[in-house]
Amino acid sequence: MDVIFEIVDKSGRKIHLSKERWKHITSPSSLHPYMTNYLQEIKEALTKPSKIVTHTLDNKKADYYLYIKERGVYLLVGVKYLNGDGFVTTAFLTRKLIR
């Protein structure tokens, strides 16, 4: 698997972003092609999040939020954990915390 980055999150868990997931997030046919300019912020959301919300129906999923003051929005980075490590599933901007 080709990896864009692997990072240790705020709670000490390894999380990676694969090339396949990055393509899914940023492709012109996706809902979030503007995310190509937010790679550094995605890393920051994982290491210094404003908030982490674990999904209520699936505790193997969490949303990491980073508030971007200049834009008045949150960057949401979705993560799924398998065998203790995580991988980024999605990333996009939102005006409010979703969960």
Residue ranges and their predicted role:
Residues 1-99:
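Ribonuclease/tRNase effector modules and their secretory precursors
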